[in-house]
Amino acid sequence: MSASSSDDFLQLVSGTKIMFGSLPLTHRYGGHQFGSWAGQLGDGRAHLIGIYTNRFGSRWELQLKGSGRTPYSRRGDGRAVLRSSIREFLGSEAMHYLGIPTSRAASLVVSDDNIWRDQFYNGNIKKERGAIVLRVAKSWFRIGSLEILAQSGELDLLRMLLDMVIKEHFPKININDSNKYLAFFSQVVSETAHLIGLWMSVGFAHDYGPFGFMDSYNPDFVPNTSDDEGRYKIGNQANVGMFNLNKLLKALNPLFSPRQKQLAAQILEGYPQQYYKGFVELFKTKLGLLGENEDDDYLIAFLLKLMEDSRADFTMTFRQLSEISEDKLKDLNIPKEFWALQDIAKHKNFSTWIAMYLLRLKGNVGDSDSERRRRMSSVNPRYVLRNWMAESAVQKAEINDFSEVRFLQQVFQHPFLVQTLAERAGYAQHPPTWAEDVKVSCSS
């Protein structure tokens, strides 16, 4: 019997047994919801049960989500439903194998107990199956962990917590440096710009509750039915990042000298440029462009506008550009299996963009068509976790059939490789007609 099927392991990942020497704890954090300060938010249903260091020296914090009430549960029951737990389990793993920094999911345990939820906040309360996810991350601290202390005037605790975070998770920062908090802020700004750029490069709208990968390209894509005004639409993610960093700066300001406050404000002012520069570089890579050209940002914007106008599939447009030869593009000879390119090829300006693109590819010194396609296929996934895939897996899991959950988990371990079974399942084809009806919400 493997360790993962032992009773001790099952009790551990279901939260019914505590590891020897473990002292479970929960984070206290606050935050903003839809732009307004909401006060203390959690952790209302997550327990940190230990820290694990693997054989490579990487340190991981182990956390159970959906494991019951905490001192910060407010009016919640501390539980999580199966549908949202499956989505987080698959979503975080899919992001990891796409090469995007993320928390990971180590296990998913289904409870025998049912819990009450109003999934779409429309008064339709029903029983749903509960679940617990064991998830891991380098750290579970967040901006709200610092905000709550600054908001309540607990500056000594704020300083202590920040020193610990820097010491444990920002080893390049000298803990004795008088500018350590400024260096911390600068690194968080840079990493935030980079992370959101990575999300955009795969068409991902955050977070692991009501998240979504775009089907048709649409900068107004909002996977969350609770977001009536589109605050968190995919095209606004960089702006929300700026908002969050503003709140982090506000939390850190009591620890800064007047000069440090000025420098921190300048660092924040540089965020939009950092983000946009990274965004352009990521999309240049997706298009197989080498070197520098002053018109690259226009070439990218032109393509995205064509995709928006023609409702072209985001993932497969870039993937099929990775697979088609330059000769076929030059002749506008789009085979029927390149269905996403056929959709965008109907646009009256597609031939103009193709001519610009092929001319730009000629500037790839020492490159070849086969090398371009190889390079592009290594960064443009063929499979992403579309909401209809997750919904199909959830519906089967609700009746104790977890085969599709396991299958998707396997598929997303190799998102850039053509997989026979994934092709048969239609994961690289036009989404089914019912996919447009899939809705997700904050309810979990």
Q: Which residue ranges define each predicted feature?
A:
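Acidic side chains
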Residues: D77-G78, D207, D313, D401
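N-proximal short alpha-helices
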Residues: G68, G78, M214-F221, G363, ...
